[in-house]
Structures are given as C-alpha cells and as structure tokens.
Amino acid sequence: MRLPVSFAQQRLWFLDQLTPGEPTYNLPSAFWLEGPLDARALQRAMDAMVARHAVLRTSIVGYGGVPEQVVADTGTVPIERIELPLGLDECELTQKAESIAVELARQPFDLAAAPLIRTALIVAGPDRHLFVLVVHHSICDGSSMKILIDELSAVYRAETAGVPASLPPLVMEYGDFAVWQRDRMRGEELDRQLGYWRERLRGAPQLLTLPADRPRPARRTSRGGLATTYVDAATTQRLAAVARGANCTMFTVFLTGFAATLSRYAPQADTLVGTAVSDRTHSELDPLIGLFTNTLALRMSMADDPAFTELLGRVRDTTADALAHKQLPFEKLVADLAPDRTLAHTPLIQAQFDYGSLASPTLDLPGITTRSLELSTSTAKLDLTVYADAHDAHDAQVTRLSMEYSADLFDAAWADRFLGYMTTLLEHAAAAPGTPLADLPMLTAAQRVEPRNPVEATLATIWVDLLDTRAPVGVHDNLFALGGHSLTATRFVARVGDAYGVQLPVRQVFVSPTIAELAGVVAAHPDFSVTKGSSRLTELDALSDDDLDALLRAALAQRNRRRSG
C-alpha cells in the first residue's frame, strides 16, 4: 500500500537524498539484561509489534522525486543473535558487547528498504545479554520509542506467562495521520498559521554566529559529538522555585538559561532557537508509533540587557504564543519564508533546546534486571542542540545537560566550556534571578584566576576597557562569553599590536578566546617586543599582585562609569 508521507518524513527523506548513508537520524536504545531471558519469547514479542504497528513495516520510496510511504502487508524484524568470543573475562565481554552496540547504532538505513528498524541480542554469558534496538527517526520519535519498548515488555510478559497481551486498540495508523495532516494544512487554517509565523519571524536573523574552533565549511557534514554535565540538586530546586514565581515551567527556565548563554557568545541580541514539540493533538494518536514531532522557531530577544527574570517572562510569552500555533509543519514554514538556501548551514535554525528528550524508557521483563546503556551515533543535526532532563542521583533530582554539537565547527573542549558556562549562569540566576544578564558570572569563583604576569595584566586591562561588562574578569574568561564580538576582537588585536608590536590575525582571538591563551600566543610571537610598550611594561613589572588587582578594578570601574553616563 502506498500513502503520502508526513511533512516531517518528507524532510528526512530529502536530507537522506542530500547526504545518503548517514546515521544522523538513527534512534538507538540498548539494555543490559541480567537473568534467565527467553529469547524466543522476545522474538515473538517483536513479531507482535511489527504486526500491530504498520509503520514498522513501512519504507519511504521516491517516485518521480516525490516520497511516499510504502506499507508491507506483513513483515518481520529478526533479532540478530551475536555470540561473543570465548575466553574473554567479564570486563572484556562488556567492552566488546558495547562496542558492537555502538557499531549497530551507527549503521545507516536505506529508507527505501523496510524494515527501518534493527535489533540484536549480544550474548555475554548464559544469563547476561545486551539487547540493542535501533529505529530510524522517519518512523519513530522519542515518545514512540517509549511506546514500542513498553509494549514489547508487555507482550514478552504475556508470552512467558502464557496469556494474551492486553494492549489498547489502534483505531488508526500512522499513514492515516499523514493523510489527515496534509488535509488539515490547507486553505484558511494554513493561511492563519502562516500569517502568525510570517509576522513573528519578519526580519529575524538567518544565521546564528558563534565563535568556533574552525571556519564554517562550504558544505556541512553530520560529524558530531556529545558533551554532558549536571546542574546539582540544590540549584535545580532553586530554579524550580524561580519557575513557580514566574508562573512557568522548568522547560522555560532552562530555555532561558540556554538563550542567555548563547547571547554571551553570539554578537546578536536577536536569535532564533528551535525546540521540538509533539503533534499528537488527538487521543487516537496516543498509542501510535510514528514521527509526530514538529520544530518551532522561537525568536529570542536579549535587547536592553534584561534581568534574568525579565528574559524569563519574554521566553514564557514567546513560547506560549508559539505553542498556540504549533500545527504549522516546520517544513511548510521554511518553504514559505524561503531563506537563502545553502549547504553550509541548516535553514532558519542552527541551535535547538529540548527538555526531557533524553529520558530513557526501560524494558520491564519478569525475572530480568535491566540497565539502560546510552549509545551515541557521533552525529549532529544542527550546530548545537542542548537537551535537559531530570535525572535521579543519590536520592535527589539533578538536571542533566547534554549537548550534541557539530564537529565541523567545535571541539569537545568548546562544548564542555559552553555547558560549564550555562551551568554557572543558571546557578547565579537561581540565587539572584533579578540580576541583569551581563552581570551573571559564567565562571565560578574557584575558576576565576587573576592575571599572573605583566602580559596577562596588560591584556586584561585592554579587555576590560573594550568589553561592555560589569562582571569581574579573569584570565580564563571567554571574550565572547563576556559579550565580545567580531568588532571587539578587531579592536583588541589592534591594541595588542600597539602594546607589543605583534600583528595577530583577528581569527586568533576566536581560536584563543581567553587572556591566558592569548598571553601565551603574544609572548611566543617572533615580533614580540617588550620595548614597544616598555614604559607600560616597566610600570607593570614594578607592581605587586595587589597593585595589579587594583589597576584592573580601576579600569573596570572606569568602564562602568562610561556605561552609566
């Protein structure tokens, strides 16, 4: 049977045509299973899932350049049994099994060949298995993965107990949703939705400019990485209180923190941030497996250096308005706005924030102890996507922050710094939510180091004079995180040249964006000359550590007086 694709499926098919053979949109899950597993019952449960959900028998095939869903009447997803070599100890077995799981997660799918799902059972011992499940995003999303795993567990339990499984009836299939979605997005409803988004995004920037480790290539790839950190339980609790006080959700609070951190990196007060929302608007869709997510383009304004609470209110209102108009498929929006199309970056949105996206569903099998194993495909859909989700740790709830980042642009250290800055900013915002964004520190007091030598002191003095910030400056502070931008970097390089006779490329500031890093570059430069600014250096050499600290604070105070005047 041939059916129309949904708008989201259409976009994924197009991306697959553009860069075939990529695992970017693979959704992997894996579970360590300890106990007497009935592998045959697990296979029967998987067969029942394929029979129940037509989308698991679906491929996406192009006919004359137009993709369609092709649904097979029957199908099977065999669980591949992988026996590990003999003679390995438990640690080696674990490493080997998890290595195979990663390989399975990264194997691409051919969208024209159903099923777009693969499973494997890696045998690491008589009662020890690693179950791997990989589904392509074109037929599944995060909530659908939970449905699949929950129902797989329910049928397995029924099979091992010798009773029929009790599952909610399906009154429609995903193909019906795709037909309904296309019928809905026509005429007056389409005009109403487009009218809102046209007005909301009028004049919005098409590109988020972030200081990167490398120039943006002419054609982006899906190479990516994953970085993770945690917001501690105390800060999470304080942020929950901030959310209650602002009559908003934790999603809004963390989205505000993400937007605030971006604003300290990007030289623009107007930013588009994407977020994923569910298009399950009717109860009949609740038990279905399929791709029901849509992307909203949220326009964030950091103009006039708002306090965190003020920005929180802006984000809350922006999000509420967007959710009231969430039915317009992102693909329709892009087609209507027709931004400049380029292979260098994704259209409209290069940064995204999602809340709760990494919560792992759990296999619940009788007599089996289950432990989830998170797998990464080492890919990135955008320049950066930050996920936040509640995470239990030592009987307390913390918040896990994970960043999927483009390896075309950023190194792992860049991603770690960004998450660290975001975490510190949130900690200070939780303690003093009325603080203006520019005054929220992004380094902890322990991380902030005062200049340790005359070169660092000189660069810090220049820095303080150029940057529009009232926050203290340390040698590990990031120029761009403090509000610097391309023009600031250009002026900084010129001032450094005046002081030391070195001609640094402006790009060096992007590559080495801290005082400590730049001081090392300046001192190692072949044209470095202490005589160029000898009087200044002699003066600095004579200063004690306390005097250097006072000099920097005086420069900072002078800068603040100019701002307030």
Predicted features by range, described:
Residues 59-60, 152-172, 200-209, 322, ...:
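A short N-terminal helical cap/helix-turn-helix that marks the beginning
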Residues 15-24, 168, 190-248, 338, ...:
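Flexible, P/S/T/G-rich "lid" or insertion loops adjacent to the active sites of thioester-utilizing
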Residues 8-34, 63-88, 103-104, 113-118, ...:
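Acyl/amide activation-and-transfer machinery of modular secondary-metabolite enzymes
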Residues 2-75, 88-184, 192-193, 199-211, ...:
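Acyl-group handoff/entry surfaces in thioester-processing enzymes
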Residues 20-26, 54-55, 127-128, 182-194, ...:
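His-Asp-centered acyl/peptidyl-transfer active-site segments
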Residues 27, 45, 55, 134-136, ...:
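C-terminal lobe/hinge of AMP-binding adenylation domains
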Residues 66-70, 74, 173, 427-436, ...:
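Phosphopantetheine-dependent thiolation modules in NRPS/PKS and related acyl-activating systems
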Residues 34-57, 133-150, 225-267, 282, ...:
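Acyl activation and transfer enzymes in specialized metabolism, enriched
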